[in-house]
UniProtKB/Swiss-Prot annotation:
Family membership noted in the UniProt record: Belongs to the metallothionein superfamily. Type 1 family.
Chain residues that bind a divalent metal cation 2: C7, C13, C15, C26
Pfam families: Metallothio
Organism of derivation: Canis lupus familiaris (Dog)
Phosphoserine: residues bearing it: S58
SUPFAM superfamilies xrefs: Metallothionein
Gene giving rise to this polypeptide: MT2A
Stated name of the protein: Metallothionein-2
Residues at which a divalent metal cation 5 binds: C34, C36, C37, C50
C-alpha cells in the first residue's frame, strides 16, 4: 500500500491536481509523479510529471 495513496504498491490510482503517489502509478497522468523537480534530480527526470521546482523533493531524497 502506498503511504500517500489509496492504492497498492505497483498498482494504479487516480490523482487530481496534486500527485503524491510514490509506490504506484497515477492513471490520470499515466506515469509516476513528483511534486517537485530540482536540478540534477535523476529520479524526477525518469518519467515523472513534475509539478514545480524545489530544493526539497521527497521523491529524490
Amino acid at each position: 500500500m502506498d503511504p500517500n495513496c489509496s492504492c497498492a504498491a505497483g498498482g494504479s490510482c487516480t490523482c487530481a491536481g496534486s500527485c503524491k503517489c510514490k509506490e504506484c502509478r497515477c492513471t490520470s497522468c499515466k506515469k509516476s509523479c513528483c511534486s517537485c523537480c530540482p536540478v540534477g534530480c535523476a529520479k524526477c527526470a525518469q518519467g515523472c510529471i513534475c509539478k514545480g521546482a524545489s530544493d526539497k523533493c521527497s521523491c529524490c531524497a
